[in-house]
A protein has these predicted regions:
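Compositionally biased, low-complexity intrinsically disordered regions
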Residues: 1-2
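Short, acidic/charged, Gly/Pro-enriched secondary-structure junctions
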Residues: 96-131, 146
Length: 307
């Protein structure tokens, strides 16, 4: 990496905060503890496999008042994803320290009802071409913070219109075909973004994937939560945590809170009719939090704000 890509701390403090909306720390072999870098100049090689092939992993987190929520859960999932891709194990204490340092120096976040909010991302790339088949060191890590967009905050209260879409292939047990990377959060998100464009062109906001057998899986970038009142009992469901579903940190946190509040918990299988007949459906993700699904395939769904 050229020295010009690294800016001195004194310069960063004086000018960088005033001109950039994102704050970035780079960790690599030369700087294992991380250094602040200027995101407006080149930081990676043109043959980096994260850039050319999506060969890497990432996590997206929410920071409120400069404290990252569920950081431990995200670091655990990042480690699991890296292991599936045969990337070196991330060092959680180094990453935790870098995240905390980043948030102390980050530019101003978005002011919301929760406080000052930032999106925080950790990205680990495979590195240059020669790192693809060898186990030689090569990966680098970027950690960045930026204000949460108003459009995301809006979804928390106004909800989303969703469409049911087939996954396109029958999900398998994660362990049977490890090269399919089921349950890993990889940089290969082209399909997810194509899905969002597809539904938005048709008047919806998001998608919920289903199998060929019409079992509910997950959202394009979220977990699915379904509430039902059964014989006077509140039950919260999510699809069974197999079949290539990414384990949701927000879903896990919501389930724990619901359990403590006296809810019963269930793990699928769920079908479209379960969603249509439910007392509430939500898409759960770390930054958007819990967005109510107001319409599914154009049909209005029940939604009780008290739930």
């Amino acid at each position: 990496m050229r020295a010009s890509t690294v800016i001195p701390r004194w310069f960063w403090m004086r000018t960088y905060n005033k001109t950039m909306s994102s704050t970035v720390i780079l960790l690599n072999e030369q700087n294992p503890q991380g250094i602040f870098v200027d995101p407006s100049v080149p930081l990676i090689s043109v043959d980096d496999q994260g850039f050319t092939r999506g060969d890497g992993v990432f996590e997206t987190m929410l920071s409120v008042n400069r404290r990252v929520r569920k950081l431990g859960m995200h670091l655990s999932r990042l480690e699991s994803s890296a292991r599936m891709l045969d990337l070196p194990d991330p060092e959680p204490e180094i990453l935790r320290s870098a995240v905390e340092r980043l948030m102390r120096e980050a530019t101003a976040g978005a002011e919301t009802a929760l406080g000052e909010e930032h999106i925080v991302k950790i990205i680990i790339s495979r590195g240059p071409t020669q790192a693809v088949t060898s186990m030689q060191p090569g990966p680098y890590t970027l950690i960045m913070a930026s204000p949460v967009p108003a459009s995301i905050v809006k979804r928390r209260t106004e909800g989303v219109k969703a469409m049911l879409l087939p996954r396109g292939h029958e999900p398998m047990d994660n362990s049977a075909y490890p090269w399919l990377l089921g349950g890993a959060k990889t940089l290969s998100y082209a399909v997810n973004m194509a899905v969002l464009r597809y539904v938005q062109e048709r008047g919806a906001d998001d998608a919920i994937f289903i199998t060929d057998e019409r079992r509910v899986l997950e959202g394009a970038t979220s977990s699915v939560l379904v509430a039902k009142i059964e014989d006077g009992k509140k039950v919260l469901y999510t699809p069974e945590p197999s079949h290539g579903i990414l384990p949701g940190t927000t879903q896990g946190a919501v389930f724990e809170a619901a359990r403590q509040a006296g809810w019963e918990l269930g793990f699928g299988p769920l079908y479209p009719q379960d969603l249509f007949e439910s007392d509430g459906v939500w898409l759960a993700s770390s930054v958007r939090l819990i967005a109510p699904v107001t319409h599914l395939n154009g049909t209005a769904l029940a939604h009780d704000p008290e739930l």
